[in-house]
């Protein structure tokens, strides 16, 4: 168990007090306390489609999907059920420059939220059958995106503005690239990019005293 210790910086205004803490392993923790009946906890990674090479188009997004599909401790059903059983919500998204995983729940359940986010970050197993299932889901998403004028304009703009650069490539990837990913590809991208120096843990809302907050799994990050 680790206490929240490290270099600190406080940001204050009339409505909230935010504190950032940087640990020795490079991980940053952002604590934003304000009067709310709920709590949001998130993992924000400085990793997105911009980190992909031409053979990896869409892998950051697929890795985000696969994070919810099983760990060493939970299967896909358990990950959702444990959060939903306490009235919470868990979700994620991938952008060109970031990937985020987050939960929203009651302050009294903050340890559960931290535990599950830590589990999917540290212990995802990428089951082969789930890879095939999510491959189909994402290829369907690509087809839907190709039928949406707004998405087509967005992708075209970026491809012209950032020619021959990864930021100009589509976040979802292509049917060909997504169709070729396997477990080793996902693990390699994860090992290269999912590390403490790329990670911000954000905790926002009404919570227990932040000076006494413990992160049970932070030593393993």
Describe every region a protein language model picked out:
Residues 72, 126-127, 221:
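Charged, solvent-exposed alpha-helical segments that act as regulatory interaction surfaces
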Residues 1-13, 212-221:
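Single conserved hydrophobic/aromatic residue that forms the stacking wall/gate
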Residues 2, 60-64, 133, 218-219:
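Residue-level micro-sites within transmembrane alpha helices that shape
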Residues 12-78, 187-213:
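His/Glu-rich zincin catalytic helix
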Residues 1, 20, 71, 175-178:
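Short basic coil micro-motifs at the edges of alpha-helical modules that engage polyanionic partners
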Residues 22, 76-213:
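Charge-rich, well-structured scaffold segments of protease-associated domains
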